């Protein structure tokens, strides 16, 4: 076992930071965004969510000396052969923009008869930067991409994922 009083979160996504902080608050774990250490987001060069989450967690843990939690996630649309997938955050290019990403996906699916999709998320927890046994959790949620946004409590593709 390891002492988990402080946990660096390898993300600059304010929505994710807020959700993780809320989830871990009852456990009395201090969630520290990597930006508090002046760590910039690392590139996500890999073709899989697991590899990208692992490289982000290792980078944050190396820079801070703290245990690290990182995720990589995205929406995968069946008609688009899994796109945007690992490119979900930058689907419409740089700089990252939820609004532009959603607009691009709406345009791509405007005439599609099948808008089935799934949201995939991988979370990696490292006890230290060289942890040989990272804790890896995966989640998958099936749904449909809708052209008109709904709701107001989410971020990313949430308004279009039903």
Q: Predicted segment positions?
A:
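Anionic-ligand binding patches
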Residues: 2-8, 14-162
């Amino acid at each position: 076992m390891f002492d988990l009083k402080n946990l660096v979160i390898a993300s600059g996504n304010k929505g994710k930071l807020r959700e993780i902080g809320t989830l871990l608050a009852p456990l009395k774990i201090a969630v520290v965004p990597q930006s508090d250490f002046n760590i910039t987001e690392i590139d996500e060069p890999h073709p899989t969510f697991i590899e990208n989450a692992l490289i982000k967690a290792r980078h944050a843990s190396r820079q801070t000396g703290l245990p690290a939690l990182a995720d990589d996630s995205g929406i995968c649309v069946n008609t688009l052969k899994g796109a945007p997938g690992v490119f979900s955050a930058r689907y419409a290019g740089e700089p990252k923009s939820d609004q532009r990403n959603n607009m691009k996906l709406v345009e791509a699916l405007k005439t599609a008869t099948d808008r089935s999709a799934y949201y995939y998320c991988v979370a990696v927890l490292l006890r230290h930067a060289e942890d040989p046994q990272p804790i890896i959790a995966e989640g998958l949620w099936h749904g449909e991409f809708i052209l008109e946004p709904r709701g107001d409590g989410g971020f990313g593709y949430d308004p279009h994922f039903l």
